[in-house]
C-alpha cells in the first residue's frame, strides 16, 4: 500500500540481511517511523510491545526474527531456544506458531552453517505468500460487497480493530475486500470501531482508510448494535487471530459482541483470514484457544496528541480500581455467516473449510 504516494510493506529485509525493517505501529497515526530489527530479541520485543501486530504480520516477523537469531547461533540448541523465545511473545495468534514450526521443520535437518540464509529465504517466501493470500481474500470478499451494492446504494461495512495492510505484509484481511471494491468503483463506506483499549480501529484502520481514500466514519465501540438496529450496516467484516477447524473465530476483544448484534439484526457477519490462521487441531475455540491477558495500563491510561502538537499519557480510570484486560474473545461459528479465505468463502463449519482445503481431510 502507499503512504504519501510511496509504496510500503509493513516488513521488509535490508539488502544483505543485516536487519529487518518494520513500520512502528505504536507511533501511528501521528508519526510514520521505520524501525530496524537486528536480533531475534529485538524481533520478539517488537511483537510483544505491538510495534508490529496482527496475526499474519507477527508470524512473518517471527520468521525473520528466527533468521536474525540464527546468524549468531545456528546450533541445534540455538534454533530451539530462539524459536521458543519468539513463540512465547503472544499466545493467541496461531500464525506465530505456524511460521516458527514451518521454519524449524525445514532448518533442523540442515547443517548449522546453512541455516541462517535458508531461514531468510523461507521467511521471504512466507511474506510473499501472505501478500498473495491477502490479495485473493480481497478479490473474494469484494464480490460480497459488490453483490450488496447491486441493490443500488452505498454499502456500509462495519469492521472491528485493524485487519488491514498494517496487520499483514500488504493488503490486509478484513480490509482487503474493501480496498478491492473501492478501487473497482463500488460505493463503499466503512464504520470503524475505535476498538478499546488500544484504539487500533481509530488509530490504525482509520489511518489506512484515509490514506487510501476510502470513505469511513469512526464510531465508539458501543455504537455498532445501534447502527445495525437502524439499518445502518449492510455487513460486518472482521479479521481473525485464530480460527478453529469448526469455524469458531478468535479476534480482538469485542468482536463477539458485534457478532451477537449482527445475528440479532440479520446482518451478515464475515471473518477474513488466510489458511495460516486456521488451527486445524482445535474444534472448540471457547475452551481451547488461550486468551492473552495484557497489561492493565492499556485500560487505565490513554496516550494521544495534545493540542500543542506534543504527546501525553493520561490516566482515565479511578485510581486503585482493579483492571482486567483480555485481548481477544471467541465468536462461535453459529454466529459467523462465512469465512473469507484465499480460496473462496467457506461456511463456518468443519465441512465448509474442508471443501476449500480438501488436502486437510486426511490430517483432520
Swiss-Prot record:
Name the record gives this protein: Methylthioribose-1-phosphate isomerase
Database matches in InterPro entries: IF-2B-related, IF-M1Pi, IF_2B-like_C, Initiation_fac_2B_a/b/d, M1Pi_N, NagB/RpiA_transferase-like
GO biological process assignments: L-methionine salvage from methylthioadenosine
High-level lineage: Bacteria, Pseudomonadati, Pseudomonadota, Alphaproteobacteria, Hyphomicrobiales
Active-site residues, as the UniProt record annotates them: 241
SUPFAM superfamilies xrefs: NagB/RpiA/CoA transferase-like
Superkingdom field: Bacteria
Residue positions binding substrate: 53-55, 90, 200, 251-252
Pfam family, one: IF-2B
Keywords assigned: Amino-acid biosynthesis, Isomerase, Methionine biosynthesis
Name of the top EC class for this enzyme: isomerase
Catalysed reactions, semicolon-separated: 5-(methylsulfanyl)-alpha-D-ribose 1-phosphate = 5-(methylsulfanyl)-D-ribulose 1-phosphate
